[in-house]
């Protein structure tokens, strides 16, 4: 794509700490939009260059309200400096021995330091959809609750911050119109971005809501669906 003068940018729910393996694929501009739009990560320098976080009073209130509704909930936070783990947070997606990893800050979620771009909440006792919908109702206008396919995980970001808003800002800085953007997605957290882009593609392996929204459904991830679409413009 670079040789054709087409910019490509990764926009992901993943935190910066999961991005480094993608370094060779990121492209000349060298950045990835992470954490559902909360962070812009410069891969070569291994640093977050832009960060938007939850206001501390909102974070504290959200934690208290969600905990009251779901007593078994555990929390974690994604920050520019890395992850913060509350003692009660359990997830099959945590790396092995995460609770013993010295690079991860640990303690009650109320003690988290720095910018919290994404607050993670998980209650193993509550069905996935019911939990995410319940948390969204509790959070209301204080933040945006996203679901990226991780079992039972509610991802709470700052109000007004989505993949779409971050990508729109990135494009504006480069003089790229929404009409000229092709976006690919597979999960509900992609929906605002797909609605914003001039042309949207849902992966066939993706969520049914996303496939209903997109302009076109392409082959799934295992069948190189993105590559198949991009071959059209060579």
Predicted regions and their residues:
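Residue-level signal for inorganic ion chemistry
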Residues: 1, 12, 36, 119, ...
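Active-site phosphate-binding/coordination module
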Residues: 2-92
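Acidic, Mg2+-coordinating phosphoryl-transfer loop and its flanking beta/alpha structural elements
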Residues: 12, 167, 177-214, 219-221
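Hydrophobic packing residues within well-ordered alpha-helices of enzyme cores
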Residues: 19-23, 131, 135, 194, ...
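Short, structured coil segments at secondary-structure junctions
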Residues: 26-28, 35-36, 44, 139-142, ...
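Short, charged, surface-exposed secondary-structure boundary motifs
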Residues: 42-44, 211-217, 227-231
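Conserved acidic, metal-coordinating active-site core of Asp-based
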Residues: 69-184, 188-196
């Amino acid at each position: 794509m670079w040789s054709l003068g087409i910019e490509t940018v990764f926009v992901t729910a993943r935190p910066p700490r999961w991005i480094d393996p993608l370094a060779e694929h990121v492209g000349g501009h060298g950045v990835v939009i992470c954490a559902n739009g909360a962070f812009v990560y410069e891969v070569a320098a291994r640093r977050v260059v832009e960060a938007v976080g939850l206001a501390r009073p909102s974070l504290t209130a959200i934690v208290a309200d969600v905990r009251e509704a779901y007593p078994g909930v555990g929390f974690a936070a994604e920050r520019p400096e890395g992850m913060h783990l509350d003692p009660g947070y359990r997830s099959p997606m945590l790396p092995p021995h995460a609770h013993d990893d010295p690079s991860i800050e640990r303690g009650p979620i109320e003690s988290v330091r720095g910018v919290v771009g994404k607050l993670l909440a998980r209650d193993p006792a509550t069905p996935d959809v019911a939990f995410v919908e319940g948390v969204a109702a509790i959070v209301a206008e204080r933040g945006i609750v996203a679901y990226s396919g991780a079992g039972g995980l509610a991802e709470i970001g700052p109000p007004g911050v989505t993949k779409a808003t971050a990508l729109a800002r990135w494009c504006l800085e480069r003089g790229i119109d929404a009409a000229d953007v092709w976006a690919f997605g597979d999960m509900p957290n992609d929906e605002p971005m797909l609605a914003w882009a001039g042309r949207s593609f849902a992966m066939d392996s993706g969520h049914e809501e996303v496939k209903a929204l997109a302009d076109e459904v392409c082959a799934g991830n295992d069948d190189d669906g993105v590559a198949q679409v991009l071959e059209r413009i060579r």
